[in-house]
């Protein structure tokens, strides 16, 4: 080899290694008392803080995270939105990729920082997301995004400024919060025989308050038409904004169980006790980045469907679930639990304090949440600005509604991928019909007609290591198998199971790959193939510009109308991946299924350190 060639090789290796660096992180998980909304309870702290620390990496970094479990209960950590290509043992899902991390033990997760974008991490052991183990992840991209920013502004200075703003964004981890721990909360439902989902606060970056504006105010904040369309005439919410727990429309049925609403403790459904604490403050600097600021929102909610807006400020939505989308301008946007959004805001208003309104906009509860966006130097100013959302998440005018993002169906969700990325047209290679709903009790949820996914499913014998463990058993109804290199359609049907005709939304998340939502419609799925459905109902499908995400919302069924959705993906990441509802109560109640992608190319060379012992 010539001296010149040797020099080129050294330079190439240097730059490759300089970019793909190894990053080591340590997470120490502890359990102690805290009061993020001013009311004390026990919760999870990570490295002594709540929520968990934000992790910032560069695309293709080699990541090594050592998790020490210093609690008296099991834990795992799931890296939500990361594809875990060739590292399925680091997905963090008990029973699929690992055994739970027991008290006093540690686990080392190793994976590539991929794909770039806005993601998050959280506990995946039982319902412990309710207890506070969650934090933001930002993977800074290698590639040039000029084509993305030029859709917002053609000005070269703006384009450069937006790139800089996106490189160093503000992070807003939005969560819902209860006065009860996850174990206590679940026990309330099983003891009473009623699904209970009333909360106390919306937190932003671990800060919030308990608001008690009064029952009449909350009743007036109900979404227009909600009671008339979905509940008996005269239905009223409590002084916490919650619907009566024993409503048939809420609980479904009839079920062969005893309902004991008297076993619901005080202050769960009603008996609001206010507490003043503090809300998060986001300080922004209009003198930086030509007045542009990027904000990364993480919906770390367990039940709530979050809406957000900033008084007097429009924003450009440019990324969903770590995927860039062709930017669109809105004044408010709805996020389901599990999703991540990135927005770009121009700081072009009078310097001052502006309220960020972040309420629960779902039909589960009228619950407000707030933060403040403060122009640098205006910390002592009075609040200013025009509100786009009310306390309960209702648009303040018809114009606001027209300029808001609603993700429930094809005709309102036009956030197509950037750069263009579409699925194969026509038929997929495999189709799987999954019927979602409740079976046997208000808190029992299925993804496959009748099968309930246990919280300890395969915990001792994870399917990564024992992929055939469920064959010839009833538990095989909890497993789907696909072939590597195939296109797969997942057809989700809601509101057809007996007793569950009035179905609330489900926030469906697939590990290991993102999916395109190519179809959505009303009625019962009775087609022999997706291709047949496309031919009969072309208006209900989009294979040219469908959205690409890892978390999708199903429809809220009012009056027992059935709905279906079709999600398509390509199998190129063999491993055991959980597909589940991201509402913690629903997953705890059984709404999950294991998808063994690429069973014909199953990982054979699992590193020694991950082998079961």
From Swiss-Prot:
<feature type="glycosylation site" description="N-linked (GlcNAc...) asparagine">
    <location>
        <position position="444"/>
    </location>
</feature>
<keyword id="KW-0677">Repeat</keyword>
<keyword id="KW-0325">Glycoprotein</keyword>
<protein>
    <recommendedName>
        <fullName>Laccase 1</fullName>
        <ecNumber>1.10.3.-</ecNumber>
    </recommendedName>
</protein>
<feature type="binding site">
    <location>
        <position position="509"/>
    </location>
    <ligand>
        <name>Cu cation 4</name>
    </ligand>
</feature>
<feature type="binding site">
    <location>
        <position position="582"/>
    </location>
    <ligand>
        <name>Cu cation 2</name>
    </ligand>
</feature>
<feature type="binding site">
    <location>
        <position position="586"/>
    </location>
    <ligand>
        <name>Cu cation 4</name>
    </ligand>
</feature>
<keyword id="KW-0186">Copper</keyword>
<feature type="glycosylation site" description="N-linked (GlcNAc...) asparagine">
    <location>
        <position position="484"/>
    </location>
</feature>
<keyword id="KW-0560">Oxidoreductase</keyword>
<feature type="domain" description="Plastocyanin-like 2">
    <location>
        <begin position="171"/>
        <end position="359"/>
    </location>
</feature>
<dbReference type="InterPro" id="IPR001117">
    <property type="entry name" value="Cu-oxidase_2nd"/>
</dbReference>
<dbReference type="InterPro" id="IPR045087">
    <property type="entry name" value="Cu-oxidase_fam"/>
</dbReference>
<dbReference type="GO" id="GO:0016491">
    <property type="term" value="F:oxidoreductase activity"/>
</dbReference>
<feature type="glycosylation site" description="N-linked (GlcNAc...) asparagine">
    <location>
        <position position="74"/>
    </location>
</feature>
<dbReference type="InterPro" id="IPR008972">
    <property type="entry name" value="Cupredoxin"/>
</dbReference>
<feature type="binding site">
    <location>
        <position position="80"/>
    </location>
    <ligand>
        <name>Cu cation 2</name>
    </ligand>
</feature>
<feature type="binding site">
    <location>
        <position position="580"/>
    </location>
    <ligand>
        <name>Cu cation 3</name>
    </ligand>
</feature>
<feature type="domain" description="Plastocyanin-like 1">
    <location>
        <begin position="29"/>
        <end position="142"/>
    </location>
</feature>
<feature type="glycosylation site" description="N-linked (GlcNAc...) asparagine">
    <location>
        <position position="468"/>
    </location>
</feature>
<feature type="binding site">
    <location>
        <position position="122"/>
    </location>
    <ligand>
        <name>Cu cation 2</name>
    </ligand>
</feature>
<feature type="glycosylation site" description="N-linked (GlcNAc...) asparagine">
    <location>
        <position position="279"/>
    </location>
</feature>
<feature type="binding site">
    <location>
        <position position="581"/>
    </location>
    <ligand>
        <name>Cu cation 4</name>
    </ligand>
</feature>
<feature type="glycosylation site" description="N-linked (GlcNAc...) asparagine">
    <location>
        <position position="526"/>
    </location>
</feature>
<dbReference type="Pfam" id="PF00394">
    <property type="entry name" value="Cu-oxidase"/>
</dbReference>
<comment type="similarity">
    <text>Belongs to the multicopper oxidase family.</text>
</comment>
<feature type="binding site">
    <location>
        <position position="509"/>
    </location>
    <ligand>
        <name>Cu cation 1</name>
    </ligand>
</feature>
<feature type="binding site">
    <location>
        <position position="506"/>
    </location>
    <ligand>
        <name>Cu cation 4</name>
    </ligand>
</feature>
<dbReference type="InterPro" id="IPR002355">
    <property type="entry name" value="Cu_oxidase_Cu_BS"/>
</dbReference>
<keyword id="KW-0732">Signal</keyword>
<dbReference type="Pfam" id="PF07732">
    <property type="entry name" value="Cu-oxidase_3"/>
</dbReference>
<dbReference type="InterPro" id="IPR011707">
    <property type="entry name" value="Cu-oxidase-like_N"/>
</dbReference>
<feature type="domain" description="Plastocyanin-like 3">
    <location>
        <begin position="468"/>
        <end position="598"/>
    </location>
</feature>
<dbReference type="InterPro" id="IPR033138">
    <property type="entry name" value="Cu_oxidase_CS"/>
</dbReference>
<feature type="binding site">
    <location>
        <position position="124"/>
    </location>
    <ligand>
        <name>Cu cation 3</name>
    </ligand>
</feature>
<comment type="pathway">
    <text>Pigment biosynthesis.</text>
</comment>
<comment type="function">
    <text>Laccase; part of the Pks1 gene cluster that mediates the biosynthesis of an anthraquinone derivative pigment that contributes to conidial pigmentation that provides protection from UV radiation, heat and cold stress. The polyketide synthase Pks1 produces 1-acetyl-2,4,6,8-tetrahydroxy-9,10-anthraquinone though condensation of acetyl-CoA with malonyl-CoA. The dehydratase EthD and the laccase Mlac1 further convert the anthraquinone derivative into the final conidial pigment.</text>
</comment>
<dbReference type="Pfam" id="PF07731">
    <property type="entry name" value="Cu-oxidase_2"/>
</dbReference>
<keyword id="KW-0479">Metal-binding</keyword>
<dbReference type="GO" id="GO:0005507">
    <property type="term" value="F:copper ion binding"/>
</dbReference>
<feature type="glycosylation site" description="N-linked (GlcNAc...) asparagine">
    <location>
        <position position="256"/>
    </location>
</feature>
<dbReference type="InterPro" id="IPR011706">
    <property type="entry name" value="Cu-oxidase_C"/>
</dbReference>
């Amino acid at each position: 080899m010539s001296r010149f060639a040797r020099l080129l090789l050294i330079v190439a290796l240097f730059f490759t290694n300089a970019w793909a660096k190894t990053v080591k992180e340590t997470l120490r998980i502890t359990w102690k008392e805290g009061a993020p909304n001013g009311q004390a309870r026990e919760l999870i702290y990570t490295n002594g803080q709540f929520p968990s620390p934000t992790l910032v990496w560069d695309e293709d970094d080699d990541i090594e995270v050592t998790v020490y479990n210093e609690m008296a209960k099991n834990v795992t950590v799931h890296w939500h939105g990361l594809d875990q290509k060739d590292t399925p043992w680091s997905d963090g899902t008990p029973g699929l990729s690992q055994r739970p991390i027991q008290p006093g033990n540690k686990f080392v997760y190793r994976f590539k920082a991929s794909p770039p974008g806005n993601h998050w991490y959280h506990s995946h052991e039982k319902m412990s997301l309710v207890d506070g183990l969650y934090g933001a992840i930002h993977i800074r991209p290698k590639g040039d995004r000029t084509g993305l920013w030029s859709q917002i502004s053609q000005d070269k200075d703006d384009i450069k400024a937006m790139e800089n703003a996106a490189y160093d964004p503000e992070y807003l981890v939005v969560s819902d919060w209860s006065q009860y721990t996850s174990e206590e909360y679940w026990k309330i439902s099983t003891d009473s025989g009623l699904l209970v989902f009333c909360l106390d606060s919306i937190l932003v970056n671990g800060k919030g308050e308990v608001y008690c504006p009064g029952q009449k105010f909350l009743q007036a904040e109900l979404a227009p038409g909600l009671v008339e369309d979905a509940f008996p005439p005269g239905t009223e919410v409590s002084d916490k904004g919650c619907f009566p727990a024993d409503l048939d429309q809420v609980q479904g049925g009839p079920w062969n169980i005893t309902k004991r609403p008297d076993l619901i403790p005080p202050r769960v459904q009603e008996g609001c006790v206010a507490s003043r604490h503090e809300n998060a403050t986001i300080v922004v600097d209009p003198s930086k980045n030509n007045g542009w600021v990027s904000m990364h929102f993480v919906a770390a909610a367990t039940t709530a469907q979050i809406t957000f807006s900033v008084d007097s400020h429009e924003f450009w939505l440019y990324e969903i679930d770590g995927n860039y989308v062709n930017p669109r301008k809105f004044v408010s946007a709805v996020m389901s639990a599990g999703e991540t959004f990135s927005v770009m805001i121009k700081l072009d208003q009078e310097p001052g304090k502006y309220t960020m309104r972040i309420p629960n906009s779902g039909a589960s509860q009228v619950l407000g949440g707030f933060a403040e966006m403060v122009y640098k130097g205006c910390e002592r100013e009075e609040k200013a600005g025009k509100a786009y959302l009310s306390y309960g998440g209702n648009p303040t005018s018809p114009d606001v509604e027209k300029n808001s993002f609603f993700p429930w169906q094809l005709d309102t969700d036009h956030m197509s991928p950037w750069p263009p990325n579409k699925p194969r047209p026509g038929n997929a290679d495999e189709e799987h019909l999954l019927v979602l709903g409740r079976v046997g009790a208000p808190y029992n949820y299925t993804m496959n007609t009748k099968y309930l996914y246990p919280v300890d499913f395969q915990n001792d014998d994870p399917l990564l290591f024992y992929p055939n463990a469920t064959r010839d058993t009833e538990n095989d109804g909890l497993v789907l198998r696909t072939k590597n290199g195939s296109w797969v359609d997942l057809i989700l049907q809601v509101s057809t199971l007996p007793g569950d005709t009035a179905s609330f939304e489900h926030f469906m998340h697939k590990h290991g790959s993102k999916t395109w939502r190519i179809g959505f419609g009303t009625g019962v799925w009775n087609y022999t193939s997706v291709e047949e459905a496309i031919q009969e109902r072309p208006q209900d499908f989009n294979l040219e510009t469908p959205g690409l995400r890892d978390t999708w919302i199903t429809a809220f069924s009012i009056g027992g109308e059935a709905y279906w959705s079709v999600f398509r993906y390509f199998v190129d990441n063999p491993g055991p991946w959980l597909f589940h509802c991201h509402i913690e109560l629903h997953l705890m109640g059984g709404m999950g299924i294991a998808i063994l992608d690429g069973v014909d190319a199953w990982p054979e060379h699992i590193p020694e350190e991950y082998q079961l012992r």
